[in-house]
UniProtKB/Swiss-Prot annotation:
Pfam families: Styelin. This is Styelin-D. InterPro entries: Styelin. Contains L-DOPA (3',4'-dihydroxyphenylalanine). Disulfide bonds: none annotated. Keywords: Amidation, Antibiotic, Antimicrobial, Bromination, Hydroxylation, Secreted, Signal. The modification 5-hydroxylysine is found at K40, K44. The lineage of its organism: Eukaryota, Metazoa, Chordata, Tunicata, Ascidiacea. It is found in: Secreted. The modification Leucine amide is found at L54.
Length: 81
């Protein structure tokens, strides 16, 4: 999970660099905003994973967290329909 969050951050950074090199900084910011809005549940889940990776988590807490991630994923899929 932490690897996915890292990959996501790198992809967003590369996208921003590509857009700003073309001189479209405003367009890049708008695109990142759209990207965030479209994938906000995954970004929030990645943020939570990062926070929990630094602290101690019991198995029960981890299971509750994974249920929240799955629920957020289902909500996102429903919002796309």
């Amino acid at each position: 999970m932490q690897m996915k969050a890292t990959i996501l951050i790198v992809l967003v950074a590369l996208f921003m660099i590509q857009q700003s090199e073309a001189g479209w900084l405003r367009k890049a910011a708008k695109s990142v905003g759209k990207f965030y809005y479209k994938h906000k549940y995954y970004i929030k889940a990645a943020w939570q994973i990062g926070k929990h990776a630094l602290g101690d988590m019991t198995d029960e807490e981890f299971q509750d967290f994974m249920k929240e991630v799955e629920q957020a994923r289902e909500e996102e899929l429903q919002s796309r329909q």
